[in-house]
Amino acid sequence: MRKEERYQRILAHFRKEMPNVNTELEFGSVFQLLVAVILSAQCTDKRINQVTPELFSHYPDAKTMAKAEPEDVLEYIRSVSYPNAKAEHLVKMARALVERHDGEVPSDMNQLLDLPGVGRKTANVIQSVAFGKSALAVDTHVYRVAHRLGLVSKRDNTPYKVEMALTKYIPEADVPDAHHWLLLHGRYVCTSRKPHCEKCELKALCPKLLEDSKLA
């Protein structure tokens, strides 16, 4: 199957099955989204949504969090992964926002990447979800599903390479949704250790499943 046809059929499926898709993180502002995304690294959205309400009740914006110390923030995020490092990142990020952007989260990629604790994946989520830009964040779910569905090649062995490969074929209008489509498919169907192939409606297009069946 040609690469273009594979993309067309897979994207058509996702458009039909998930027409109104969005992040599962809960937030009330762009700053709160940024905090939630930073916290979500190596952690589930469910866990993040459990800790952010109390965190945001004390630190609803960059200016209030910038006045805190990492140990203050740590009290509210102890149950997430790497809490000490994340508390440090959050306070430094908030202070940088206040110093450089009057407490507002910028939409520019380079300005986002200059913030403490913000990498390309996080910056892409902010650009896409908060500002509606054509940006595709590649997390572990997106990376795994893209490879299993044959959307990218084995040579695309870094998140950046996967991002570039995906955005080469995905129509610009679909790019923001494509992140959520692939992520949610990876989170609930094409899971890491025991993928639910029996209920996957894309199994006819899955080279990974075909390869596994030949080895059986």
Question: Could you describe each region identified by the protein language model?
Answer:
Residues 2-215:
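Catalytic cores of DNA base-excision repair glycosylases
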